[in-house]
């Protein structure tokens, strides 16, 4: 049974109903419709915390989806799951892949910055200031890109850039 039929959340049900209506009325190929169905089911599983099921759906959606913009969001969500699972190297890979297809995803730049900042903090705890500085510099670059795309957002990152004298 498709996940959209078993989810009890009101918002998810509403989204599923609207998505099903749109799938019927918007002229798209069967492959595009199938890709969207997997993407929708992946989002539903992800919101329930069922990451293994979400990944299966997202991987199938990436296999079917041909539009680069739509693929960027699928890849971004895969990155989110890997981030949640502590698989930061994989997460960075998927955020990069998402940005290759859609360079206007400030949330991907932000998440990459958070991972780099975290790795910098780990390096400080391990006493490796050179590596910490490199990770922090990389975090700064990603945060600058996120802020450039959405100037009113990422206030904490903006403040960190100022405090660490990395903001130009």
From Swiss-Prot:
Protein name in UniProt: Photosystem I assembly protein Ycf3
Function: Essential for the assembly of the photosystem I (PSI) complex. May act as a chaperone-like factor to guide the assembly of the PSI subunits.
Keywords assigned: Chloroplast, Membrane, Photosynthesis, Plastid, Repeat, Thylakoid, TPR repeat
Lineage, uppermost ranks: Eukaryota, Viridiplantae, Streptophyta, Embryophyta, Tracheophyta
Domain of life: Eukaryota
Its membrane topology: Peripheral membrane protein
PROSITE patterns assigned: TPR (PS50005), TPR_REGION (PS50293)
TPR repeats: 35-68, 72-105, 120-153
Location of this chain's protein in the cell: Plastid, Chloroplast thylakoid membrane
Gene3D superfamilies: Tetratricopeptide repeat domain (1.25.40.10)
Family that this chain belongs to: Belongs to the Ycf3 family.
Cellular component, GO, one term: chloroplast thylakoid membrane
Gene name of this polypeptide: ycf3
Species the sequence originates in: Chloranthus spicatus
GO BP, sorted A to Z: photosynthesis
